[in-house]
Amino acid sequence: MNAQESLRPLVHLPGVPEAVETARKAIDEVHEHPANRRGWATTAAEASVRAARASAAVAGGAVEIPEEGTVTDPLLAGSLRVAEALGPLLPTWQRAPLQALARLHVLAAADLVGADEQERLGRPRADEEVSSRLELLARTVTELGGQAQAAIPGPVQAAVVHGELLALAPFGEVDGIIARAAARLTVIASGLDPKGLVVPEVAHFRRQDEYASTARRFSSGSTEGVAAWITYCCRSLEAGAREARSIADSVRS
């Protein structure tokens, strides 16, 4: 069974088609904002920083970036490194997702381990189930970069990648930061938000209890749990589009 066949049933789960369409519309509209048509590099850069700050905060890190000096909080520093690397990593994500995930772990966790542990960064936990499910996820991502992409909406693709990485916690640390970054890569790669303007991470930060509980429901594998997670992710994308509009409005004013 290929990626398209395995994910197609998810597209038709209760509430998913409507949530996908609403998210798509919100993202399309923010891409038409005058600031995003002419100066999208500026708004995308601000979106990337806001995403990194929110993702670090969800993981328990600092939110604010010091006006002077360097970032000392290891989670925020790692999240900012991840954000800076997403653009260059996009081709690797589409071609060799496991390599991209390894790189994300190196960047996110670099300040959390001592010099004698640096070599283990980028290596998933030695667990047979983790290895097999990561391989399956990688095959799914690479297949979705081909013909299956048009058949499986970007919000569904991103929700599956995001939820599976949260459930697996493949590295044992900073897995949430990695999962959110991988979801962001998927949203961009799928063509849903090719400029990286949307900031769903802010919604995850503001709704942390719902985020965590719905992710657990996804990991259960139940039909209701998977549908709840996908629709939650769609609502977060919609909220992320509102955040993107606020960025664009501030740039234009």
Where are these regions (language model features)?
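FIC/Doc superfamily catalytic core
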Residues: 1-253
